[in-house]
């Protein structure tokens, strides 16, 4: 999926770095400067593959390119030893809560066993369903899993990140979160599906539910619910996104980053929505350990 709102930011980046349209076009594999000109004016799209190539070619951090202040997460609680050396407070009880995606399982939490030196690691289990049906389940399970802990870290995958933002923002003991291929706007996901299949609001309202060719089912009740979603997420969050993700589109991701100054983006240039190969799991491990 392409992103049309990125044009002014690309132009600003190019100007700040004294690049001509010809030079930028050549470095990104475009034929001629006219493509860059159209992108900057908002008349043409720039795919996330090209954005990832831009980041890699010019050794940029996504937050730097989009002028997003990726503030560091709050440090873990510390105490000052007699020698004035700052060390971590070993008396704190810490837990990592993993929230799986669609058709996933809490058992996937075992993939994060390497964190057990400092954290208990648990998975939050839930059955797929409508968001309004899952609210009490997810909040109840999360409270049960985190009771008695001083510090909580959330690792959420795909739609699990949506549930975290939607239902866990009021839990004050969450110190940091890691979102992998997060669905950051369920409403936008539904709108994109409707556009893809040529479905209008009126048609969905009249039919109530529409089964799509890919097996997904659109529901008007679901559409109404997510249209009123309110994101109050303030937790310092690391976001991992595949450049070839065909589920979460560029526009949704950029809006999330702009709306959440405590979020920081990492793009894996050769990944899709699902991170499941041994190499991709090693990438996730290094990504988490780098900032936790």
Positions of the model-derived regions?
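DNA major-groove recognition helix of helix-turn-helix/homeodomain DNA-binding modules
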Residues: 47-64
């Amino acid at each position: 999926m392409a992103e049309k709102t990125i044009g002014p930011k690309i132009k600003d980046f190019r100007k700040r770095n004294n690049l001509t349209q010809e030079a930028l076009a050549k470095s990104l594999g475009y034929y001629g400067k006219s493509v860059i000109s159209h992108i900057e004016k908002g008349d043409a799209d720039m795919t996330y593959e090209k954005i990832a190539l831009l980041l890699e070619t010019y050794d940029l951090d996504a937050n730097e390119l989009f002028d997003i202040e990726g503030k560091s997460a709050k440090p873990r609680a510390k105490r000052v030893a007699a020698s004035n050396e700052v060390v971590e407070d070993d008396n704190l009880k810490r837990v990592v809560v993993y929230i799986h995606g669609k058709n996933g399982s809490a058992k996937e939490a075992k993939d994060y066993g390497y964190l057990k030196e400092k954290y208990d690691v648990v998975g939050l289990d839930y059955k797929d369903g409508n968001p309004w049906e899952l609210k009490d389940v997810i909040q109840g399970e999360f409270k049960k899993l985190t009771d008695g802990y001083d510090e909580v870290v959330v690792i959420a995958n795909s739609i699990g990140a949506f549930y975290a933002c939607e239902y866990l923002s009021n839990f004050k003991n969450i110190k940091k979160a890691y979102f992998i291929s997060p669905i950051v706007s369920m409403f936008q996901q539904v709108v994109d599906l409707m556009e893809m299949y040529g479905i209008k609001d009126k048609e969905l309202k009249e039919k109530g539910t529409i089964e799509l060719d890919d097996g997904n089912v659109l529901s008007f009740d679901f559409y109404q619910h997510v249209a009123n979603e309110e994101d109050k997420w303030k937790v310092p969050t690391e976001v991992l996104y595949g450049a070839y993700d065909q589920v979460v589109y560029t526009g949704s991701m950029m809006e999330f980053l702009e709306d959440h100054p405590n979020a920081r983006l990492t793009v894996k240039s050769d990944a899709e929505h699902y991170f499941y190969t041994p190499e991709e799991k090693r990438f996730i491990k290094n990504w988490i350990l780098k900032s936790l």
